[in-house]
Structure formats: structure tokens, C-alpha cells
């Protein structure tokens, strides 16, 4: 358990694991790009693949990448909150550990930890209040950090003291315990949580695919279960939609400035009823005469 969020892990990962002086990074969105930029301060952070060419609306084919067999690790961000994408396959290179930022998808479904050298995540999406990060690290990767690595940036420091080298983020740890018990005792485990989350996402994606007013830009295969992005025909309509949605009780739907449009984050805590209510609102908004007027005008301009 670490104070701070996953952004601190962007530095801790290379400080602890970049023993060969280089690592491979797959950039599938904003946070994986930031992680690569931070790692470049400590060695060669090679971007071996990126989906920037299509504004991160897909995940690079992990089986078609030329990995460096001398890389200390391969780094990915497994779910991309801003762009609404998620990995469906994992890079697996013999002798090269996989490091994954799972901040926005941890505990949403089962994870085979044996495929990873390190999993880290900020807790604020599915685990606990903001202010803490958690790392799961394979034993053989520990203890190789240089002596110059700051004490609190060394994984072994906290591991040796059961995460209590200094005063730990007690409230976040306590809340994590409650959430884990809830997932096990009330939900019935991560297999059931996955079914619930996939059902929620299916409701929203099925609606988006069944009409013409709103549009989801992500390639179907890589659509995120946690973050559903969509746009209306024009940016001015996006702004108007978000304002009316807020008045109706649907808050924080505005998409990130890098993407625009809207984003519905449907993490574990969002009940199915919330997604159904959002779809009902989308249907009513889409059916407004003014919406169709804007849609037709946009189509006319597009074909001029």
C-alpha cells in the first residue's frame, strides 16, 4: 500500500525494475504515454507500439510488435479511461516481465496475476477513496533497485515493513478491506462482478449501436467495460447535452478535452439501474425535434 496515486508508480516502476537500462512501452492512451515519458528520465523507454494514429480508438496488436528481448519489462495501461478502450490480449514475451497499470479496471473481473511481473493501480475507481496506490509485485523482481533510489520509492522498503514504514493511508486501507469483503460476500466474487459489469456495458453499447444520433468511436473489439465514450453530431451539441443531462441528475458526463464528447464511467459502484436510467435519458434526448434538426444540418454540411 502506497501513499499517493498510480502516477507515482510511473517513476517507481523504472526506478525498481529497469535493470537493463531500457524498457518497452505500449502507448494506448494518455496515461500510458505519461508513464513512458516519466520512465524516459531513468533510461530508454522505447515506445514499441501506439494507437495515436487513430486517436487511441483501438489497442495495438500485441502479437505484431517487435519487442526488445533485452528490455527490463513491457509496460501497458490495461484500460484507458479517457478513450474508452481495454486490452483483450496481453503481450507475453519469455523472460520479459509484463507491468500493467490497472487503475481503472482492477476488481472489475478476475485477473490471472501469474501473467504479470507487476500490477499497480490507484484505488479511486473500484477500490477505495483517492489517496492510495497498491502494487502486486513478483518476488524475483524485488531487491534489484540501485542504492541511490530514494527510500520511499523502493518497493522493498514498504514490503519489509508491511506497508508501515511511515504512517500509512489508514482510511484508504480500511475502506479497501470493506470493499474486498463486499465483493466476496455480497457479490459472490469477481466472476460475478464481471458478469454484472458486462451486462451494464452491453445495455449502453447496444443502445449506441442501435441509433444514429450518438456515436461511439472505439473499435468494437476493444471497447471498455468501465468507460463508454460517445459523441453527438457536433461539439456544440455535446456541450448542450451535458448541461441538460446535469439538470436531469446525470453528472460528470463531459468527455476529456483530448476526445471531447461524453464519457459514461460505469465502475463497480454504478448499479445497473443507473445505466438503464442513462439510456432512457439518451432516448428521450435523441427523440427531441431539435436533436434531429441538428443531425440533419450536420449531415448536410458533411456532404457539401
Placement of each model-derived feature along the sequence:
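Active-site C-terminal subdomain of aminotransferase-like
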Residues: 118, 123-205, 219
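Conserved PLP-binding active-site segment of the aspartate aminotransferase-like
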Residues: 226-234, 250-280
Amino acid at each position: 500500500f502506497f501513499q499517493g496515486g498510480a502516477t507515482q508508480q510511473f517513476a517507481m516502476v523504472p526506478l525498481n525494475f529497469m535493470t537493463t537500462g531500457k524498457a518497452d512501452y505500449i502507448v494506448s492512451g494518455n496515461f500510458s504515454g505519461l508513464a513512458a515519458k516519466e520512465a524516459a528520465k531513468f533510461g530508454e523507454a522505447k515506445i514499441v507500439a501506439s494507437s495515436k494514429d487513430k486517436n487511441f480508438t483501438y489497442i495495438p496488436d500485441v502479437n505484431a510488435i517487435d519487442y526488445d528481448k533485452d528490455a527490463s519489462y513491457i509496460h501497458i495501461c490495461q484500460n484507458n479511461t479517457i478513450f474508452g478502450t481495454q486490452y483483450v490480449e496481453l503481450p507475453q514475451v519469455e523472460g520479459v516481465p509484463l507491468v500493467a497499470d490497472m487503475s481503472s479496471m482492477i476488481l472489475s473481473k478476475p485477473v490471472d496475476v501469474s501473467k504479470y511481473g507487476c500490477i499497480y493501480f490507484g484505488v479511486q475507481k473500484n477500490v477505495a477513496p483517492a489517496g492510495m496506490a497498491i502494487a502486486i509485485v513478483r518476488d524475483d523482481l524485488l531487491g534489484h533497485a540501485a542504492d541511490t533510489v530514494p527510500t520511499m520509492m523502493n518497493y522493498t522498503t514498504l514490503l519489509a515493513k508491511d506497508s508501515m514504514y511511515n504512517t500509512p493511508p489508514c482510511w484508504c486501507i480500511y475502506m479497501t478491506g470493506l470493499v474486498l469483503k463486499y465483493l466476496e460476500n455480497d457479490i459472490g466474487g469477481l466472476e460475478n462482478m464481471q458478469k454484472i459489469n458486462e451486462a451494464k456495458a452491453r445495455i449502453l453499447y447496444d443502445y449506441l449501436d442501435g441509433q444514429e444520433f450518438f456515436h461511439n468511436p472505439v473499435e468494437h473489439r476493444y471497447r471498455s467495460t468501465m468507460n463508454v465514450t460517445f459523441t453527438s453530431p457536433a461539439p456544440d451539441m455535446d456541450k448542450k447535452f451535458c448541461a441538460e443531462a446535469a439538470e436531469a441528475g446525470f453528472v460528470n458526463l463531459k468527455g476529456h478535452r483530448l476526445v471531447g464528447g461524453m464519457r459514461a464511467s460505469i465502475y463497480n459502484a454504478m448499479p445497473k439501474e443507473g445505466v438503464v436510467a442513462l439510456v432512457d435519458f439518451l432516448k428521450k434526448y435523441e427523440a427531441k425535434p431539435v436533436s434531429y434538426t441538428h443531425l440533419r444540418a450536420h449531415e448536410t454540411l458533411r456532404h457539401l
